[in-house]
């Protein structure tokens, strides 16, 4: 079976049950994800899309779901790389039976970086607080997400984030890094910042 579907199949927790049924119903599943803006074959789409291919229904073999990275520009369809997502569901150590996000991995180097990030048990969310120091974050940024020490401008996409005072500078630098952007591209929708 081959489908062209909304790219939310990868990042939305609402589709966790759908991904479970896909992983359990077929031997091999491939999801390629494309941005609507610069991928020529989808340039008139109103949302970014994924191509999902499912093979060998009701097979005893269950290899899970393989994903590409999210393509910003049209790739050669014959050279798309995929990686198995089974051990990279988010939150860490989730299964398809639980509420999760599916990563858009693609090339092996992305898997290597994820392995290093997921090796550690510390979570950035542990330094967030309901009071303390405040930074400002831009929660929507098609190509970048930013953190600021002062509110840069008025927008519905600029929000305060409270952080333990000792970690304000650290979190500001982290959220302005390409590593943070990498994480959001892997697990997010490519436009809005995940809060988990």
Give the positions of each predicted feature.
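Short amphipathic beta-strand starts and helix->beta connectors
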Residues: 142-146, 184-187
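Short, glycine-/Ser/Thr-/acidic-enriched flexible segments
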Residues: 8, 59, 140-144, 150-151, ...
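Structured loops at beta-to-helix junctions and adjacent beta-edge loops in soluble globular domains
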Residues: 54-57, 70, 138-140, 162-164, ...
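Signature of N6-adenine DNA methyltransferases within the class I
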Residues: 1-130, 148-158, 193-195
